[in-house]
Regions:
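Hydrophobic anchor at the beta1->P-loop junction of P-loop NTPases
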Residues: 108
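Conserved lysine of the Walker
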Residues: 116
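The conserved Walker
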Residues: 112
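C-terminal accessory "lid"/substrate-recognition subdomains
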Residues: 251, 259, 265-285
Length: 285
């Protein structure tokens, strides 16, 4: 349950009880709330805390004290409905553990030397970071020499996903990501000569991709593999095919570096126009 997990993360020593019996249909000041709460919590209630006046009557029905928290909405100038409808405008008021639910993820993919790392850093600095770096680069830097093995690519995905989960708690409304399991699956095809179905089973599509074209000059780097333009183009074609095979939402970004920046900024601005869509928070259903 989404809200229950949030509360348990924020207050690990508290016992969180979910009232999920249709009581949500009652008005907040309905006197039936007292018996409903006693049914879920038969023990004595010492205090009822809230930011609205209805808690006074609720506390009385439970023989408890009331405590109205921030009644003028100065510390938290928005209610839960406003946050859900426009979370990006209230981002600073959303606790870290809640942010990933409302966050959108934008992943940068493309062949080597097309600006993935640069663009992820650029966008994070412009719109608020941090961003999720490519885990494969430090792995490549410190690995032993020799051909890649399938299990190494799984290890790279493990590291990347773990970093993403942690960094998402501190990121802005858009989580910028350099590379992901889908691109790692394409790397498997390039390095091993065949696909890895068990690796592809781990693909989790973001809200949107930026696919960077290979039409910029190659920049030499000891951690890079495919400098020949025909191999870069093959890599690009494989990525594009993989995106389309999985029905991924993506924008092709091409041209000079300044053109790539402008196109990428436009993508982010479009993503920020609407909140992330959900079927609803389970505790509200």
């Amino acid at each position: 349950m989404v809200r229950k997990s949030w509360m348990e993360s924020l207050f690990p020593e508290a016992v969180v009880i979910v009232v999920n019996n249709g009581a949500r249909l009652l008005a907040s000041n309905d006197p039936k709330w007292g018996p409903i709460i006693r049914g879920f919590h038969p023990e004595a209630v010492d205090r009822v805390i809230g930011s609205e006046g209805y808690i006074v009557a609720l506390a009385k029905s439970l023989n408890a004290q009331h405590f109205i928290l921030d009644p003028m909405w100065m510390a938290f100038p928005a209610n839960s409905i406003e946050v859900r409808e426009d979370p990006f405008s209230h981002w600073k008021s959303i606790p870290d553990h809640v942010r990933p639910y409302f966050q959108k993820r934008l992943t940068l993919v493309g062949p080597e030397s097309t600006g993935k790392s640069y663009m992820a850093d650029f966008l994070a600095k412009k719109f608020g970071g941090p961003y999720v770096p490519e885990y494969g680069r430090p792995y490549e830097k410190y690995r032993s020499s020799g051909d890649y093995r399938a299990e190494e690519l799984h290890f790279i995905v493990d590291g990347h996903v773990a970093h993403r989960k942690t960094l998402s708690l501190k990121a802005g409304p858009i989580l910028f990501e350099d590379t992901d399991p889908l691109l790692t699956a394409v790397w498997a095809e390039m390095l091993l000569g065949h696909s890895l179905p068990d690796l592809e089973a781990r693909i989790d599509l973001p809200d949107h991709y930026i696919l960077l074209d290979a039409n910029v000059p190659w920049e030499e780097d000891p951690l890079r593999y495919y400098s020949k333009q025909e191999l870069r183009q093959e890599f690009f074609t494989k990525i594009k095919s993989k995106l389309e095979a999985y029905g991924a939402s993506y924008t092709l970004v091409s041209g000079s570096w300044s053109e790539r920046e402008a196109q990428s900024v436009a993508v982010v601005k479009e993503m920020l126009k609407t909140p992330k869509l959900h079927g609803g928070i389970d505790a509200q259903k």
